């Protein structure tokens, strides 16, 4: 029965049962409604907090575009991870539900792909080259959510540098596999083991979180869930 189809009595009865099941007094919650302020859009979306997150390091106008664009990307990454989580938690999962969430993920990636012109056409190259130097050694490479999307989308072996895949299997410790991920090559000298400041900062912040995430999605990633779908 949908909430909008309930009579007033049925709705009150449902509320009564809900709070009693939680060991709480339904009347206390109902009386609280007498004093609660109606929800407002700007409070629900937390607009003031959201619009206060853009802090420039220079006075160059296009730096603001750069900051907002990447913050929007991170929000979309969060939407993608949210959909992947719904798939991974569903046990079992139907083909219909899998396809629904995958369709949402695909649309989010379409949104990202279609936004590249904001970077290419929406900023003056001269301004970008100036404020970019103030961000060193920070890089979009350090987007933890992007890396998590990779971990949650496929089996770990598919993210290993091709040069080392033959040495990695299901019994390989996650820490060892992590050190041989394809993107490690962007900041690591495999002959000396030396890592760039960019990679060291990234790992100082997220290494433990990444290892936990890799373990969590080892058998719950999108590819593994897809293979478990009914034939």
What are these regions, as identified by a protein language model?
Residues 2-231:
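Surface-exposed peri-terminal alpha-helical interaction modules
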């Amino acid at each position: 029965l949908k909430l909008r189809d309930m009579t007033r009595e049925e709705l009150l009865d449902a509320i009564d049962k809900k709070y009693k099941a939680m060991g709480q007094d339904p009347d206390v919650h109902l009386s609280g409604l007498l004093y609660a302020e109606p929800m407002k859009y700007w409070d629900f979306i937390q607009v003031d907090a959201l619009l206060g997150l853009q802090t420039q390091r220079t006075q160059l106008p296009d730096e603001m575009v750069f900051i907002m664009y990447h913050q929007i990307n991170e929000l979309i990454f969060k939407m993608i991870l949210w959909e992947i989580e719904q798939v991974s938690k569903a046990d079992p999962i139907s083909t219909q539900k899998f396809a629904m969430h995958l369709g949402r993920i695909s649309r989010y990636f379409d949104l990202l792909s279609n936004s590249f012109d904001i970077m290419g056409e929406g900023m003056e190259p001269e301004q970008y080259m100036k404020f970019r130097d103030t961000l060193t050694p920070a890089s979009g490479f350090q987007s933890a959510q992007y890396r998590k999307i990779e971990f949650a989308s496929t089996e770990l072996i598919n993210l290993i540098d091709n040069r080392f895949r033959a040495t990695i299997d299901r019994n390989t410790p996650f820490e060892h596999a992590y050190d041989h991920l394809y993107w490690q090559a962007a900041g690591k000298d495999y002959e000396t083991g030396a890592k760039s400041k960019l990679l060291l900062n990234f790992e100082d912040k997220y290494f433990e979180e990444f290892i936990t995430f890799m373990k969590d999605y080892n058998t719950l990633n999108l590819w593994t869930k897809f293979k478990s779908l009914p034939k």
